[in-house]
Amino acid sequence: MLWQKPTAPEQAPAPARPYQGVRVKEPVKELLRRKRGHASSGAAPAPTAVVLPHQPLATYTTVGPSCLDMEGSVSAVTEEAALCAGWLSQPTPATLQPLAPWTPYTEYVPHEAVSCPYSADMYVQPVCPSYTVVGPSSVLTYASPPLITNVTTRSSATPAVGPPLEGPEHQAPLTYFPWPQPLSTLPTSTLQYQPPAPALPGPQFVQLPISIPEPVLQDMEDPRRAASSLTIDKLLLEEEDSDAYALNHTLSVEGF
């Protein structure tokens, strides 16, 4: 008895897929090989479709020169540049002609002809760490080596034709005295100041008695002064009047 395997149902044919080109393992090398083959045969290269992996539905065609042909184009450019450089003729060096001297203006007076008061030697005298005096020796308190020395003035090629200007007199040459000690080692001032006078002994304030008027006492003293000014007769009359009033008052009280 023979056992037969059940035959599987026939699978339906798969639907037709669009043409996706030829799959190659190394598409870049394949392109280079095909281009070299077309270049050697002399035929115009037809646009080829190369399918890269992981792109099953997209087709690409090479349009224009690729970046792989840049080496050949660069070498061709260098050869053309060398060829063009051979065509250009190098210019011959021209000889330089000396310029004629300019004619000076008749009314121009050079500034060297007028002596400037600041053309003398300038000196520097540090006064404090943040202040320094710069000026001629007449301004400073002592002479030191100059900072800027104007020894001579520039001589003009052509003398001035205009009338000379009246400038200040030239200063006499100054003599320089070297100052070996720096400012930090200068001795201190030799002036001696007198000590302040000692304080006076005893209290400096004098106590004066001050009398404060008392208005109550004055009111009490005023009747006494008025009584002393009255005569004895007037006093007797006033006392009699006061006694009679007191007597009448007592009588009226007793009678009541």
Swiss-Prot record:
It comes from the Eukaryota. Keywords: Activator, Chromosomal rearrangement, Nucleus, Proto-oncogene, Transcription, Transcription regulation, Ubl conjugation. Residues 1-23 are annotated as: Disordered. Belongs to the POU2AF family. Residues 16-38 form the OCA domain. GO terms for cellular component: RNA polymerase II transcription regulator complex. It comes from Homo sapiens. Interacts with POU2F1/OCT1 and POU2F2/OCT2; the interaction increases POU2F1 and POU2F2 transactivation activity. GO terms for molecular function: DNA binding; POU domain binding; transcription coactivator activity; transcription coregulator activity. It is linked to A chromosomal aberration involving POU2AF1/OBF1 may be a cause of a form of B-cell leukemia. Translocation t(3;11)(q27;q23) with BCL6. It holds the Pfam family PD-C2-AF1. B-cell specific. Detected in mainly in spleen, but also in thymus, periphral blood leukocyte and small intestine. The lineage of its organism: Eukaryota, Metazoa, Chordata, Craniata, Vertebrata. GO terms for biological process: cellular response to virus; germinal center B cell differentiation; humoral immune response; positive regulation of interleukin-6 production; positive regulation of transcription by RNA polymerase II. The gene is POU2AF1. Ubiquitinated; mediated by SIAH1 or SIAH2 and leading to its subsequent proteasomal degradation. Its main location: nucleus. It is found in: Nucleus. In the N-terminus possesses a conserved OCA domain for bivalent binding to class II POU domain-containing transcription factors and to an octamer DNA motif. This is POU domain class 2-associating factor 1. InterPro entries: OCA, PD-C2-AF1. Transcriptional coactivator that specifically associates with either POU2F1/OCT1 or POU2F2/OCT2. It boosts the POU2F1/OCT1 mediated promoter activity and to a lesser extent, that of POU2F2/OCT2. It recognizes the POU domains of POU2F1/OCT1 and POU2F2/OCT2. It is essential for the response of B-cells to antigens and required for the formation of germinal centers. Regulates IL6 expression in B cells as POU2F2/OCT2 coactivator.
